[in-house]
Amino acid sequence: MTRAEEFERLRPLLFSIAYRILGSVSEAEDAVQETWLRYAASPTQPTSTKAFLSAVVTRVSIDVLRSARVRREKYVGQWLPEPLLTDPYQDPERSAELADSVSMAALLLLERLTPLERAVFVLREVFGFGFPEIASAVGRSEAACRQLAVRARRHVDEGRPRFEADRREREELAGRFFDAFREGDVDGLRELLSADVQLAGDGGGKAPQLARSIIGAEKVARV
């Protein structure tokens, strides 16, 4: 198998890692492309291509996230993660972790973490990497990575609701919400929204958007 063929085989995994670290499809695609350039230019073939490329895309994504956060501080309006409509990477053994980690709620929780914490959390909690692999990927000792994982988990848990809704119940409510939204059913939307719901808008840093969050079921339902 050529390098190009091996890379294409692993591209879905690499993109999925980058996306969960960055929260942006375009930035994840750029990180994957940079990973390919570094792999193509490498003078030797790594023993484990998967481990090598996973480490490279992780390091690239950390660097991109650090610079992206500086840009986001100057962002016009409120920056929100970019939804991923279809995840190209599938692993039956980690389907629940993969599905949960691309929800908007999960991506917003990951915004609470430093770039290193986020990378360690993604590799460990979402993809099930061992600490030796994670240490190699982020350039830290295994002990340091374990500490980063503990801190990341604590920050994420602090941001989670006290009670998790059943997955099927969430899917049913989401379906009812989108049906009401599509049909312009204001009363139906109001019934589904909590009294203290907040609506935040993201205009991509360019397009007109909400000047501030809208609070309250009645107001949000009528937007």
PLM features: what roles do these ranges have?
Residues 195-223:
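A solvent-exposed, acidic/Ser-Thr-rich amphipathic alpha-helical stretch
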Residues 164-168, 180, 207-215:
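A short glycine-/small-residue-rich loop at the edge of a beta-strand within enzyme catalytic domains
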Residues 1-30, 34-36, 40-174, 179, ...:
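Active-site-adjacent scaffolding segments
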